[in-house]
Amino acid sequence: GFQDGIDAFAYTGNCDYSHKFESNFVNVNITFSNSIMLSSLVGLRLGVWIAHGEGKFNFPYYKDKYNIAMSYSFDDYPGNPNGSDWSVAAICSNDGRHLAMMPHLERAFLPWQWPYYPEGRKDDEVAPWIEAFVNAFNWIKNNR
């Protein structure tokens, strides 16, 4: 899915750092970008599921040429499970409408989907990732 839709300049189909399928819950940082989906989450550090074996981003140009929307919170394995340049987990198009990511935020939008959820937030009905889907819905509704 994801691998077919991203420009070849950033994704090479390289195996993850471990050279095996990875399924884990890792932390990511949402960075400022043009991403419509992640706009209300900028500055947050959230847990998210990863599940891939070929998810390594390789970038031939300098970092400032890309709209990096999300990065793994750690540079090294296992915190950066695929070994992507600059620990990149997601990039977006210049207009922010297209978001290419390896983590599976759709698997972490409910608190019970998290292996650890903050003690002080036990009453949450949904996890913060739901905002990404709300942002996308609202953008579509307002830009028909």
Model-derived features with residue positions:
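Amide-donor transfer/coupling interface in amidating biosynthetic enzymes
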Residues: Q3-R144
